[in-house]
């Protein structure tokens, strides 16, 4: 295991980068070294930090421990349909996590998601046996292994908490149960800092219902998360025409598993080529999309370095405050084909708040609005 940067440590602990920087500044955590201005932490020190948060031994980090147990284990019921059969099972899992006071690092959350994924591929609750190499899901092992990471570390956790992996999940087409586990376990504070809130399935379906599926062509979700928008596309849309990208590495690993479940005959290489971990605004270079869908992040806290890069590239980033969804719209319009379709879930403010004048001007200059639908709160 290589040393982790402050950003990677924050992702593992499910805290915002701002919180991590503040902890370093206040001396609550100490990096082993700093390279090119970036703090790095070794495996041993990360384990100490996790143990201190879990036990509450470090008073300075105790508030973080309490916040995580109180707000981090909420079942996000609205993410899936009301009839989702896995809700009861997941609620039991979350209750057990709360009772045992488990620190929900990104690794631990990944184990829960991987256990569920294994069952959706047709296996019973045999996660530990999978980790031992006794069972397989064939060509998709590589996708599951990417989510699990260090097998020995996962086995150690399974042996310590076997009850967590005794729950039985069932495959429900169109239900992103993998995303629901990830979302429900992930700390609310982390989602706020990243500007990302996962979209309820009923909202996703409503947006997709307005699309001309027969002419949807090549479709992209530039902020795909665990892939729910792509999962809700009709079966008639071929994987060859589906693309997604996101900056959250765990989300992308889950989205790839979701695509493997939706398209059981798909090649792993095609899934990985189409569902990528990239920054849509600065790294994603595919163009020529017929349809772009999704729910771009609202209120993302860009760093000063990010702002400088975006300001040099996008008109919507030239103001004092850069709103993430404005820049997403501008970039999406750039990579659409002529007469392509852009369908985003956006806040009402984009229509009438002065700060969004630039993107409204761009929309009027480069596109025509076909429909606006109020989705409610």
Short names for language-model regions:
Residues 30, 48-52, 275:
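Short, basic amphipathic alpha-helical segments that act as recognition/interaction helices
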Residues 1-23:
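Polyanion-binding surface elements
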């Amino acid at each position: 295991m290589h040393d982790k940067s402050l950003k990677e440590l924050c992702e593992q602990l499910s805290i915002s980068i701002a919180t991590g920087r503040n902890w370093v500044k206040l001396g609550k955590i100490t990096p082993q070294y700093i390279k090119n201005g970036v703090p790095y932490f070794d495996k041993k020190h990360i384990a100490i930090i996790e143990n201190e948060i879990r036990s509450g031994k470090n008073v300075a980090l105790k508030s973080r421990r309490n916040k995580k147990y109180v707000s981090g284990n909420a079942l996000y019921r609205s993410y899936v349909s009301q009839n989702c059969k896995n809700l009861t099972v997941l609620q039991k899992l979350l209750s057990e996590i709360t009772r045992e006071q488990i620190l929900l690092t990104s690794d631990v959350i990944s184990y829960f998601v991987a256990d569920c994924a294994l069952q959706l591929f047709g296996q019973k609750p045999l996660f530990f046996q999978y980790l031992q190499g006794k069972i397989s899901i064939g060509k998709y092992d590589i996708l599951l292994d990417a989510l699990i990471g260090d097998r020995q570390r996962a086995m150690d956790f399974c042996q310590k908490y076997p009850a967590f992996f005794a729950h039985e999940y069932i495959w429900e087409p169109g239900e992103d149960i993998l995303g629901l586990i990830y979302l429900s376990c992930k700390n609310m504070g982390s989602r706020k800092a990243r500007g990302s809130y996962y979209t309820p399935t009923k909202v996703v379906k409503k947006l997709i219902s307005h699309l001309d599926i027969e002419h949807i062509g090549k479709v992209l979700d530039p902020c795909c998360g665990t892939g729910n928008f792509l999962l809700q596309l009709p079966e008639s849309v071929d994987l060859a025409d589906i693309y997604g990208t996101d900056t959250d590495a765990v989300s992308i690993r889950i989205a790839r598993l979701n695509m493997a479940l939706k398209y059981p005959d798909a090649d792993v290489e095609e899934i990985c080529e189409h569902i990528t971990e990239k920054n849509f605004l600065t790294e994603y270079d595919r163009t020529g999309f017929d349809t772009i869908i999704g729910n771009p992040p609202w209120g993302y806290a860009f760093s000063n370095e990010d702002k400088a890069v975006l300001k040099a590239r996008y008109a919507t980033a030239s103001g004092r405050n850069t709103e993430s969804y404005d820049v997403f719209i501008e970039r999406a319009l750039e990579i659409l084909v002529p007469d392509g379709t852009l369908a985003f879930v956006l806040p009402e403010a984009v229509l009438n708040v002065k700060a969004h004048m630039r993107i409204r001007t761009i929309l009027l200059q480069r596109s025509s609005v076909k429909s606006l639908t109020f989705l409610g709160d």
